[in-house]
A protein has these predicted regions:
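N-terminal nicking endonuclease/strand-transfer module with a His-rich metal-binding environment
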Residues: 1-188
């Protein structure tokens, strides 16, 4: 698998992301139990046709995803781990993995998708609500249009939904996935 490996950190150093998240969690007395959600993982995936038709590269996808992460995860420690440039099973779909600490490090301006009191405050735990996800999807779609990239309607329901477990059992593991799984064990 070919990948554009360049780790970027938001509100953290990418090389010490795990330790910095632990310090933030301890500071706000959060994520003390093993079963607490310590991180959230998001994937921004691009149309394979954008490579040949619109000149999308791993570097450009990484830059777009970094801007989206800054916009959608303000105040959180976030790590853009890797942009895969040949997709899973050589499908050609470039995609970027974003991991955020579940605890907001710094206070931010209130965002339209925030519906709980004090959700913008430092120490607040991220909630992947329908309102947030719809805002995130809409933002991704708008950004892809601005960049002249293909974009499906992410707000339309999928014809067939499968669970993450079903998805993972349908395809063989590769070295990147093994690395990524080991990486996540640091946070959970």
């Amino acid at each position: 698998m070919v990948a554009y490996y360049k780790a970027y950190g938001l509100n953290c150093n990418p090389m010490s992301f795990d330790k910095e998240c632990e310090l933030t969690n301890a500071h706000f007395h959060k994520n003390k139990k093993r079963e607490d959600i310590k991180s959230h993982h998001y994937i921004i995936s691009y149309d394979p046709a954008d490579v040949t038709e619109n000149g999308l590269t791993g570097k450009r996808a990484q830059a777009i995803s970094l801007e989206l992460a800054k916009q959608m995860f303000p105040g959180y420690q976030a790590l853009l781990v890797v942009t895969h440039t040949d997709g899973h099973n050589e499908s050609g779909n470039i995609h970027t993995h974003i991991v955020i600490n579940s605890v907001r490090k710094t206070a931010v301006e209130r965002q339209p998708y925030m519906d709980k009191p004090h959700e913008e405050a430092a120490g607040y735990k991220h909630r992947s609500t329908d309102k947030f996800m719809n805002t995130f999807k809409k933002t991704v779609m708008e950004r892809c249009q601005q960049e002249g990239l293909h974009q499906i309607d992410l707000l339309a329901p999928a014809e067939r939904k499968i669970t993450q477990k079903e998805y993972m059992t349908q395809k063989p593991a590769n070295k990147s996935q093994v690395f990524f799984c080991r990486f996540f064990k640091l946070f959970n």
